[in-house]
């Protein structure tokens, strides 16, 4: 039996678990192909260092292996995504492309162009929010404007119900009529960077989950004080994982709520609340 093929375009969501768009794509069809596009416009940014690219490549390697373990595949391409994503969708005869919304102006314009091109080709587009616990439109003043002061933002944001993490998608159906050539993962040198050092933080979904588990069982209870001392292991060390989306924000929030339930003192609960406010700050 053949199934329609859907693409899931990975960007800042390099994971299988707690991935809303990927889970939704798998509900539509068992034949889902992941795709990641190395965008020169982003790789050439002034804030892009070799270590950042090395971490990204490590995350992609882990994601590729996770897809393979579930019978699927992750396709990696390079070029302007405004052209490349529609080309990949057309080549694979995809009937739909899924991705997550972004807040950055460049990403929003890029996505608008890609969506328009896909619509012209008769390919469905499915988009939803994933990187935030609440989309920007959900947290506004009584006048319907974004908050400019954090305290009332936090008060409103924290009162909203938080969605639970979604499970990893079921195994993918093996491809039948469509053959996808294996594209090797490029090195940092291939992408124009030189890096021969070791990463301080291990890349990938499994490593991020392990780091979250360790933090939420230990340092989170003293975070309010220990975060002020750089020489102490008092922080979560999850910033890179959240930036590249190798761990879902709903998973992170759920871990903090579980820690609250196990807190044995007011000081511990206050520390956890302080960390939760840092998570809210990401969305302010």
Curated annotation (Swiss-Prot):
Sequence intervals crossing the membrane: none
Domain Photolyase/cryptochrome alpha/beta: 4-133
Cited PROSITE patterns: PHR_CRY_ALPHA_BETA
Single annotated GO MF: DNA binding
SUPFAM superfamilies in UniProt: Cryptochrome/photolyase FAD-binding domain, Cryptochrome/photolyase, N-terminal domain
InterPro entries: Crypto/Photolyase_FAD-like_sf (IPR036134), Crypto/Photolyase_N_sf (IPR036155), Cryptochrome/DNA_photolyase_1 (IPR002081), DNA_photolyase_N (IPR006050), Rossmann-like_a/b/a_fold (IPR014729)
Top-level taxon in the UniProt lineage: Bacteria
Any one biological process term the GO annotation gives: response to light stimulus
Protein's UniProt name: Uncharacterized 31.6 kDa protein in atpI 5'region
């Amino acid at each position: 039996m053949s199934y329609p093929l859907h693409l899931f375009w990975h960007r800042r969501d390099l994971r299988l678990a707690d991935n809303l768009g990927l889970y939704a794509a798998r509900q539509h069809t068992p034949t889902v192909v992941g795709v990641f596009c190395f965008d020169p416009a982003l790789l050439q940014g002034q804030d892009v260092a070799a270590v950042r690219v090395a971490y990204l490549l490590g995350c992609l390697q882990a994601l590729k292996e996770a897809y393979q373990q579930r019978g699927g595949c992750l396709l990696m391409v390079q070029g302007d995504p405004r052209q490349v994503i529609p080309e990949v969708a057309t080549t694979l005869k995809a009937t739909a492309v899924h991705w997550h919304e972004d807040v950055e102006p460049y990403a929003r314009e890029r996505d608008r162009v890609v969506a328009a091109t896909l619509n012209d080709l008769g390919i469905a587009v499915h988009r939803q929010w994933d990187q935030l616990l609440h989309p920007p439109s959900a947290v506004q003043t009584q006048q319907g404007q974004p908050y400019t002061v954090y305290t009332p933002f936090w008060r409103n944001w924290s009162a909203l119900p938080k969605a639970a993490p979604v499970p990893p998608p079921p195994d993918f159906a093996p491809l039948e009529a469509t053959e996808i050539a294996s594209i090797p993962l490029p090195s940092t040198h291939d992408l124009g960077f030189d890096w021969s050092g070791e990463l301080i933080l291990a890349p990938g979904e499994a490593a991020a989950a392990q780091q979250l588990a360790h933090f939420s069982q230990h340092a989170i209870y003293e975070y309010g004080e220990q975060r002020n001392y750089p020489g102490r292991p008092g922080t979560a060390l999850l910033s890179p994982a959240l930036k590249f989306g190798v761990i879902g924000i709903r998973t992170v929030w759920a871990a903090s709520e579980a820690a609250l339930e196990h807190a044995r003192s007011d000081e511990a609960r206050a520390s956890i609340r302080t960390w939760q406010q840092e998570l809210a700050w990401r969305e302010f």
